[in-house]
Amino acid sequence: PERPKIPDLDALPFPDRAAIDHAPYLDAWKTHHGASSINLVTARGCPYRCTWCSHAVYGFSHRRRSPANVAAEMAEIVERYDPDQVWYADDVFTISHPWLEAYVAALRARGIRRPFETITRADRLQNEDTVRLLAELGCYRIWLGSESGSQRILDAMERGV
């Protein structure tokens, strides 16, 4: 049976990153990718039902931590590990534009700006303000979900675009 979803992700503690020695991981990223990096997850799940995607872990429900909670974790990451960049490992980081605006404001209030890369969908970048917010936040690379020039293929994959 499916386990119940945790509705309030802010109630969870931050990952216990001190439980492992991060130096080898930071060094490996720097050696092989030119910058040290630490992952950060702001949400669980994805409401889209694309047929090719894996929903085995969090399913189709989308739950997100508050901007203030994520900004607090980011401050902890910067203070303890000072990575050159972060990887927002969400399924679709730009799923909520109002959340993104609030998160940018929360980081700005803390004086934090760190280069990052993330994953999203092309249809979540059609708003010029969203692209501006990502740039302001420090985004330098976006990994886009699989798309096609064929509407028949998009429909078969249930992309919803």
Language-model-detected regions and their locations in the chain:
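Glycine-rich beta-alpha loop elements in corrinoid/cobalamin-binding modules
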Residues: P1-P13
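Radical SAM [4Fe-4S] cluster-binding motif and immediate context
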Residues: D16-V161
